[in-house]
């Protein structure tokens, strides 16, 4: 039975909501996915994520193929063209099906008069594909990053920037966190082997396992029973560094969606954990994750800049501050970040981070441990932030966690390893 919707037009609408309205794909996609069949959901995700991952290349090709861009009310048709080009370049969908479905997208978008234009541009691309790709390989569109971000990465990592860009442009590996309350990692790896799922342990992070090929969570042994959680390896490093202990008062600040909250409780099930986030909606995810794993934490809505409003004068033995950041370390998981962020955001985020760390420091007990973490790779949010904090606070001591000259440890995204992530471990004197 033929569907009564056109998937390519839905993808074009989603891309428009990201690029024109500044919404994230994780906000846009769930409601759109409710309108389509289960089997089409993965394809919609692939079309949206893939198109945004290689956006500059697609944009450049369209500029060569059209005398003037489609603007105003026709802008969604421009995104439809991008979706068409993405399929021709990066998917195994037969070209005739790509053309037929993408051209029909113009009808679904109530622009049937533009069917001929869409068809013509896609066919012209097929004829000129080899020549266009050769030319595209010699201009800046090949980096698939906005120029401001490319410049920042080049300045921060003069010897490594190309590897970082390359990692950002690839699909991410799927990492799991084995729940040590149920199984050792070795035991769970055996269960996966019996289920025919190929995986390997992380060399450093004790609960982390990488799947050699992604699979549905429903295929993972004991997922519904909380035996395992999907979480990137670098994100797991936060709790390894925090080293929570039973009986301690622990704060997970900026906790949503709860991956680190639950990891703390798996590591120290008798700890008293408070999970706080400013976003009431995202706190629902924290509660869902706690429920699936049958763990308990005190979950509160609150602003990290005003902790007295949600914890009074309470002090904690350990604090994990996973600060709001540019998310430049997780671009491969969320390619829309490249187009949602602006250069001016970085200074604003650094100011917000400084405000939060200042506000929460008095709530750490003397002798207590704070881990400051971000999923950014930009020094302004990471090593520079920690250096400035240490200069302001004689009562803070940095625990060395890396071999760099800068304070803290900076993980960079790697095709076979974790995302870009920064951690610094501070002890209150």
From Swiss-Prot:
Enzyme nomenclature, EC number: 2.1.1.176
Binding site for S-adenosyl-L-methionine: 254-260, 277, 303, 322
Cellular component terms (Gene Ontology): cytosol
Catalytic residues, chain numbering: 375
Reactions accelerated catalytically: cytidine(967) in 16S rRNA + S-adenosyl-L-methionine = 5-methylcytidine(967) in 16S rRNA + S-adenosyl-L-homocysteine + H(+)
GO biological process: regulation of DNA-templated transcription; rRNA base methylation
UniProt-recorded Gene Ontology molecular function terms: RNA binding; rRNA (cytosine-C5-)-methyltransferase activity
InterPro entries associated with the record: MeTrfase_RsmB-F_NOP2_cat, MeTrfase_RsmB-F_NOP2_dom, NusB-like_sf, NusB_RsmB_TIM44, RCMT, rRNA_ssu_MeTfrase_B, rRNA_ssu_MeTfrase_B_ent, RsmB-like_ferredoxin
Family of the protein in this entry: Belongs to the class I-like SAM-binding methyltransferase superfamily. RsmB/NOP family.
Stored NCBIfam families: PRK10901.1, PRK14902.1, rsmB
Function: Specifically methylates the cytosine at position 967 (m5C967) of 16S rRNA.
Protein name: Ribosomal RNA small subunit methyltransferase B
Origin organism lineage: Bacteria, Pseudomonadati, Pseudomonadota, Gammaproteobacteria, Enterobacterales
């Amino acid at each position: 039975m033929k569907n009564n919707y056109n998937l390519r037009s839905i993808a074009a609408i989603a891309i428009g909501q990201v690029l024109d309205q500044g919404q994230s794909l994780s906000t846009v996609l769930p409601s759109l996915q409710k309108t389509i069949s289960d089997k089409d959901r993965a394809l919609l995700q692939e079309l949206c994520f893939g198109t945004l991952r290689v956006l500059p290349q697609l944009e450049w090709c369209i500029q060569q193929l059209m005398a003037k861009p489609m603007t105003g009310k026709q802008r969604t048709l421009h995104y439809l063209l991008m979706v068409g080009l993405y399929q021709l370049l990066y998917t195994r969908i037969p070209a005739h099906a790509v053309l037929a479905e993408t051209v029909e997208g113009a009808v679904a978008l109530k622009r049937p008069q533009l069917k001929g234009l869409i068809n013509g541009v896609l066919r012209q691309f097929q004829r000129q594909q080899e020549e266009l790709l050769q030319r595209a390989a010699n201009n800046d569109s090949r980096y698939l990053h906005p120029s401001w971000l490319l410049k920042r990465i080049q300045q921060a990592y003069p010897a490594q920037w190309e590897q970082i860009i390359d990692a950002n442009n690839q699909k991410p590996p799927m990492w799991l966190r084995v729940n040590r309350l149920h199984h050792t990692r070795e035991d769970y790896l055996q269960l996966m082997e019996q289920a025919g799922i190929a995986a390997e342990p992380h060399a450093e992070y004790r609960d982390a396992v990488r799947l050699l090929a992604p699979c549905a969570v429903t295929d993972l042994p004991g997922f519904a029973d909380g035996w395992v959680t999907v979480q990137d390896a670098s994100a797991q490093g936060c709790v390894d560094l925090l080293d929570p202990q039973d009986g301690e008062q622990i704060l997970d600040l900026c906790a949503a969606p709860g991956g680190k909250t639950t990891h703390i409780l798996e590591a120290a099930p008798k700890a008293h954990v408070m999970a706080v986030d400013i976003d009431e909606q995202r706190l629902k995810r924290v509660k869902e994750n706690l429920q699936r794993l049958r763990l308990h934490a005190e979950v509160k809505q609150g602003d990290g800049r005003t902790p007295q409003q949600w914890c009074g004068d309470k002090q904690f033995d350990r604090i994990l501050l996973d600060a709001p950041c540019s998310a430049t370390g997780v671009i491969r998981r969320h390619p829309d970040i490249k187009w949602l962020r602006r250069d001016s955001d970085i200074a604003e985020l650094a100011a917000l981070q400084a405000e939060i760390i200042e506000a929460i420091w008095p709530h750490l007990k003397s002798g207590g441990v704070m881990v400051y973490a971000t999923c950014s790779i930009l020094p302004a949010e990471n090593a520079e932030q920690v250096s400035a904090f240490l200069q302001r606070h004689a009562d803070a001591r940095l625990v060395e966690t890396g071999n760099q000259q800068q304070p803290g440890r900076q993980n960079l995204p790697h095709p076979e390893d974790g995302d870009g992530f920064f951690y610094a471990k501070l002890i209150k004197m």
